[in-house]
Amino acid sequence: MSCLFNSYDPYFKQPFGAVRAGQSVHLTLCIPEELGYVDPHLVLQKEGKYDVPVHYRMKFDGQTPHQNHFSVDVVLGDPGLYFYYFDLYTDFRRIVRGADNCGVVSWQEGESWQITVYEPDFQTPECIKGKVFYQIFPDRFCEGIENKPMPFPDRLYQADKHAEPFWQPNETGGHLNEDYFGGDLEGIRIKLPYLREMGVDYLYLNPSFDAHSNHRYNTADYLNVDPLLGTNEEFEVLCREAAKYGIGIVLDGVFSHTGSDSRYFNREGRYGEGGAYRDPNSPYRSWYDFDPKYKGGYRSWWGFETLPEVNEETPSFVEFITGEGGVIDTWLRRGAAGFRLDVADELPDEFIEKIRTAVKRVSPEKFLLGEVWEDATTKFGFDHRRTYLLGKGLDSVMNYPFKNSVLDFVKGKPAQQAANEILSICEHYPAPAINTALNFLSTHDTERALTVIADEPANGRGREWQSGRSVTGEAYEEGMLRLRMAYAIIYTLPGVPCLYYGDEIGMQGYRDPFNRAFFCWDSHEERLRPVLAQLAQLRHSCEAFRTGELRVLRAEDGILHYQRIGKTETAEIIVNRSEHIIVEPLASGKHTEVNPMGFTIVVEENGHNPNHSYYDIQ
């Protein structure tokens, strides 16, 4: 039986994907004659406590050999998630979503399709679209000022930049992340030419505020740069110098918790006798929940006593973060291009909306990104479906689903499965959000891409097993080829690619802290960097990579062939995971060869007489 319905196919659903509130959606069914008489209805339900299914009768559109065609138009008025299937109104049959997104006939309830409806005025920064990001873990990138004195005696300086980060428990059995390699803001400034040569447009910096750990997710002072990284003035200099290279700086905002060792909480007493922990009358006391039922006597992030959670609805905290002259306002006016919100799905929607207001008050072109590990439109939290991607909260999110699908594909996952997973995210996310989603293969929270591709899975084994591991020889060589393929996909999918520092030279490492080693500046691995530079140049020059629609032409036998369809240009990308050369037909009717474990990109001007530009990057 042929496909009855597929929301990824423009014949069956127009427009593709999410829609603005008030926009009309056209749906078409293709019913084989063998199903007999049917009277199909669209059954549509908005998700909500008081919402009920609404039935829309579909009109007969005509016949093709052995098939009857029916369609319906529906206007979706309010932002939210809508779910739908089709009732055939005969013999209790319905058409529900099958495993490959195609409609299948069922006599019982099944999976529905989703339509995301977002705010009609939702816009995201145009300056982000079509660009390239680069993530830096500040302590581990580059030491611009050498032999700096440690600002606090409990910080341990690591002079050997090739050393493995500390991973063994200290004398108390804990991991305090007290080893510092000395990376700083001046080191980032020095490397701006290197970054621009790779086509980098934005730097996403892991936390840079004053904090007493090398990762700095335990904020001690929201309004000052960590002294080992530099000063507030040096941050402003970095922003100005980066702007000369066309590079913006996006900061990491950690607002779900502070450090216990902070001027706000001050459990350790570093900041005198003040702070919420030591002083019941502290102005910060209301930021935290103190109760003997909690470990340590206060609520903490996932039970880590060094990370006391804040009440994000406390007026004084909200004002401190989002008010005029507050944390967001201060850093954007110092030169930052935006914020990435740590654990965004653990922040209340109302708080995120106030952060958005603070960001856009400075400029609509300032960027607000959220850390969400799953499909951000379907996340539950605080006893309800999260709404932060519908136009009043985040601009976009970190695209972990793409990362997982791309890495699994280059390792051997069926191409069709990877394509369906990617299309699902593209379908669910509002266009302004998918066009600014941060696409990556490695982060400070995940294993490095080359390790995932080429090394043995950790499978829950601990740090002792992970320590010192790396692949060499044939496994490394093949891994680099597969990594090259993976980045070709990441650079050409909807969204903006983000390169994690060191991936370009084949750095390896399992999870924290092994994925956070110091950048190996004396590495001789130079094969991937020019490829990334060419991919970045292509993104900058081809408008299809800014907002072009994704359309998959073929996904089988290790071949992933897709288009990005822009207003004036169409880019066609063919990725060949197989071990032999393929000859692939293009949408234009011509053919192109694609090397084993390689890729080819063809850019055409839209129109009757397109100009062809072939990019087979070696």
Task: Please give the residue ranges for each predicted region.
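Beta-strand-rich binding/interaction modules
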Residues: L29, G36-G48, P53-V54, Y82-Y84, ...
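C-terminal beta-strand-rich structural cap/linker in extracellular carbohydrate-active enzymes
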Residues: I31-E33, T592-Q618
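Conserved, mostly hydrophobic/aromatic
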Residues: L29, I136, L195, L205, ...
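Substrate-binding/active-site clefts of carbohydrate-active enzymes
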Residues: F137-Y202, S208-R334, I355-R361
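Active-site-proximal helices and loops of the catalytic beta/alpha 8
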Residues: C239-G248, S256-H257, S262-E273, V327, ...
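Carbohydrate-binding surface patches
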Residues: Q14-F16, H26, L553-L586
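The feature marks proteins involved in alpha-glucan
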Residues: M1-S24, Y50-Q135, F141-K161, Q168
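Aromatic/acidic polysaccharide-binding cleft in carbohydrate-active enzymes
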Residues: D139, F382-D383, N435-V471, Y487-E525
